[in-house]
């Protein structure tokens, strides 16, 4: 007798094809798992296939089938297995959940609960950036979260640019206060009190902070939300030349940290005049390309010239006792958004992959069994690693070794040490590298030496892979049709453009409406329009600039 059995768990229906066979006085049942929440057609098709199996001897389920069935029953995946290339949106959403990076179930729309695995990584990201900023002369400050309305009103273009995004608190004591969307109007209010002489310059500050913006676009965890975590640096200078040197220093900082430590490839663009930071004279921003073909704006640095200095009366006396306005710059690396790029750029179909220096845990130690001998050796290894400032953990849970392997691979831990009786007897360790997906055995006494070498190789390898993918995504074009094809293929188009000043904005609007993309800007090293880039991609006038066009978040 063959029939379909249905079991309900946690609002899901699980289907099994069952064959009952009488053997003497006993009845044996053979089962084939069909799946969960199937429609009628799916059920019929799977029943037919199952019946073919049940007519003969049922083979033992493969390890993969067992894992999948267990995942369906428990709702908890021990392995990941979603194609990042084919379905990046699903991949990203699921890895945030399964790797326990953030929880969206907080009951205010657009706000995310940051979970330990993401916080541990972002704390390290903060530390590296702050270390570089302090080495370059920036002093840390903590400013209030609220900014009075009168501060906002002092710089007209800044007010116009940010007003729609501001969270306003109810009037307190007759004063209207905003939750900071950014802190120019807070810092420069104080700069006017602190700066007196040319001897005070350059005046270089920064703070780590959370900021609030009422995003009207669809929010995505870490990528776009109504509260995010960042560093903002604000500096005052005596001359334009000094201010522009600071802008270039900010770009160097971005390369030193984002590329060389976090492993993210990017291009710094000067934004066109219609896309500048509100109140800025010039805006420069780093764009990182996600696997879905959209660019993410990462750190931006802005030359504000004297605009804010005049609005807030930020002045200094030069050597001749003449009073002058300061030239101000600001720089904003959004840590939570950069973390989104780390997830997207380095992850693969198995889950996360972390660069060594920012991994929440750098080494996971997996005892093959929880016997005292093995656990004691695992503890010795853990102590040795921690003494050498390597973050590590022992997974002595009751899960099977295979499940532990899958789980920590999904979490992106760079190195795994597998420890069983055989390893102890041979005085060797089995090491798995997440970046290469390879295992090797090493002598127990060579562990620290191995990790020192591997940690450098892991970063180099991830950077090399990311750089290669990014480089191959930039395509030259000279026609609108070709431009559309490049953008639809998830790549960045390099093309000629008539102007990046206000007279080019109409062509940029056509790019948005017809191509569903944006003019991201020009490279810092000015490129000469020639060949395919010699004429404007939209109006066909002689091109003044070579620009880059892409979809964005």
Question: What are these language model-derived features?
Answer:
Residues 1-70:
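Conserved glycine(s) in the ABC-transporter nucleotide-binding domain "signature"
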Residues 69-553:
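NTP/phosphate- and nucleic-acid-binding module
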């Amino acid at each position: 007798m063959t029939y379909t059995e249905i079991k309900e768990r946690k609002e899901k229906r699980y289907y099994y094809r069952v064959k009952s066979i009488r053997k003497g006085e006993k009845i044996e049942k053979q089962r084939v798992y069909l799946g969960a929440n199937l429609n009628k057609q799916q059920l019929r098709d799977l029943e037919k296939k199952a019946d073919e199996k049940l007519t003969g001897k049922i083979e033992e389920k493969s390890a993969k089938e067992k894992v999948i069935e267990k995942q369906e029953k428990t709702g908890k995946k021990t392995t990941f297995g979603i194609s990042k290339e084919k379905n990046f949106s699903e991949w990203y959403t699921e890895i945030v959940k399964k790797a326990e990076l953030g929880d969206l179930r907080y009951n205010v729309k657009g706000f995310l609960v940051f979970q330990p695995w993401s916080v541990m990584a972002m704390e390290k990201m903060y530390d590296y950036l702050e270390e570089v900023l302090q080495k370059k002369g920036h002093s840390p400050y903590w400013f209030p979260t609220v900014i009075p309305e009168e501060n906002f009103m002092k710089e007209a273009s800044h007010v116009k640019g940010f007003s729609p995004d501001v969270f306003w608190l109810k009037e307190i004591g007759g004063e209207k206060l905003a939750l900071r969307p950014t802190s120019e109007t807070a810092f420069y209010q104080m700069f006017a009190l602190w700066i007196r002489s040319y001897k005070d310059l350059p005046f270089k500050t920064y703070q780590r902070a959370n900021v609030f913006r009422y995003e009207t676009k669809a929010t995505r965890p870490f990528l776009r939300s109504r509260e995010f975590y960042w560093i903002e640096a604000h500096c005052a200078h005596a001359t334009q030349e000094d201010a522009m040197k600071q802008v270039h220093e900010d770009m160097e900082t971005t390369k030193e940290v984002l590329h060389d430590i976090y492993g993210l490839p990017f291009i710094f663009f000067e934004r066109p005049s219609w896309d500048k930071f509100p109140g800025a004279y010039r805006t420069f921003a780093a764009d990182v390309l996600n696997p879905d073909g959209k660019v993410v704006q990462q750190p931006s640095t802005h030359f504000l010239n004297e605009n804010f200095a005049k609005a807030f009366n930020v002045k200094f006396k030069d050597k001749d006792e003449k009073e002058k306005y300061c030239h101000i710059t600001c720089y904003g690396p959004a840590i939570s958004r950069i973390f989104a790029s780390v997830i997207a750029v380095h992850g693969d179909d198995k889950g996360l992959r972390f660069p060594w220096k920012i991994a929440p845990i750098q080494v996971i130690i997996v005892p093959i069994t929880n016997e005292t001998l093995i656990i004691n050796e695992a503890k010795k290894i853990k102590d040795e690693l921690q003494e050498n400032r390597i973050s590590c953990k022992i997974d002595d849970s009751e899960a099977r070794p295979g499940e532990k392997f899958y789980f920590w691979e999904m979490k992106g831990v760079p190195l795994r040490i597998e420890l069983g009786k055989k390893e102890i007897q041979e005085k060797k360790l089995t090491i798995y590298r997440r970046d290469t997906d390879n295992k090797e055995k090493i002598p127990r006494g060579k562990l620290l030496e191995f990790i020192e070498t591997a940690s450098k190789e892991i970063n180099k390898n991830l950077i090399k892979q990311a750089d290669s993918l990014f480089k191959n995504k930039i395509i030259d074009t000279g026609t609108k049709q070709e431009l559309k094809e490049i953008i639809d293929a998830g790549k960045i188009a390099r093309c000629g453009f008539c102007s990046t000043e206000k007279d080019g904005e109409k062509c940029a609007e056509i790019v948005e409406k017809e191509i569903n993309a944006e003019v991201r800007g020009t490279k810092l090293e000015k490129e000469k329009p020639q060949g395919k880039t010699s004429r404007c991609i939209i109006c066909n006038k002689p091109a003044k600039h070579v620009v880059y066009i892409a979809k964005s978040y």
